[in-house]
Curated annotation (Swiss-Prot):
Name of one Pfam family that matches: TMP-TENI
Cofactor binding, per record: Binds 1 Mg(2+) ion per subunit.
Residues bound to 4-amino-2-methyl-5-(diphosphooxymethyl)pyrimidine: Q43, L44, R45, M46, K47, N75, T114, K143
Species this protein is from: Myxococcus xanthus (strain DK1622)
Protein name: Thiamine-phosphate synthase
Length: 218
């Protein structure tokens, strides 16, 4: 029997559906608004949600994304990704090691890893990762203890030498997503700029357009 094919990481905005941002709106509702705006990659980040509620929400968002042709990844929780049949996981320094995530998920799902430099990107590749999240590119308030800001020049340098596709993370929004794309990013992660917009769906549409403009130099 052939191994299941791994999803392809789509280029463009990488939208995070975070339970700590706009908590009065459900994760499923937030994800629906993101996808309606053209998001093709949604990551569920559920640090505050009880496990059973998180599992139910993940299953609903996975189903939503499948219907709309988008991918759904889960932050940190490999168990939730497996139980909900998500498209993959993203792990950080304090999460399940990438090689263990790959062993648990098998070859048919994506594994992303947060790194700080080219050395980390090479280690992630050796561990079986499909892509790396690199940053923070800009100052960010989403993380309680953010790492030192890279800036666009250092970010672009790592992108050039990385053996894996790079997702720009940290402080990315409509005002700067084009510059992240122009620096060579495969994707650009957006959290608050999308979820706190007056119209989430319209903001995502504009983020998609801005990324493409930066990517192609329009």
């Amino acid at each position: 029997m052939n191994a299941p094919s791994r999803p392809h990481l789509p280029r463009g905005p990488y939208l995070l559906c975070d339970d700590s941002v706009l908590p009065e709106i459900s994760l499923v509702d937030k994800a629906a608004r993101l996808v309606a705006g053209g998001a093709r990659l949604v990551q569920l980040r559920m640090k505050r949600t009880p496990i059973r509620e998180a599992l139910a929400a993940t299953r609903q968002v996975v189903a939503l994304c499948r219907r709309e042709g988008a991918l759904c990844l889960v932050n940190d929780r490999v168990d939730l990704a497996l139980l909900a049949d998500a498209d993959g996981v993203h792990v950080g320094d304090e999460d399940v090691p990438a090689e263990d995530a790959r062993a648990l998920l098998g070859p048919g799902r994506l594994v992303g890893v947060t790194v700080r430099d080219v050395v980390g990107a090479r280690a992630a590749q050796a561990a079986g990762a499909d892509y790396v999240g690199l940053g923070p590119v800009f100052p960010t308030s989403t993380k309680q203890v953010p790492a030192p800001v890279l800036g666009l020049e250092a970010f672009a340098s790592v992108v050039r030498d990385s053996p894996l596709p790079v997702v720009g993370i940290g402080g990315v929004g409509l005002v700067n997503i084009a510059s992240v794309a122009a620096a060579g990013a495969h994707c650009a992660a957006v959290v608050s700029d999308a979820l706190l917009a007056a119209d989430i769906t319209e903001r995502v549409r504009r983020l998609v357009e801005a990324f493409e403009q930066g990517r192609f130099g329009a």
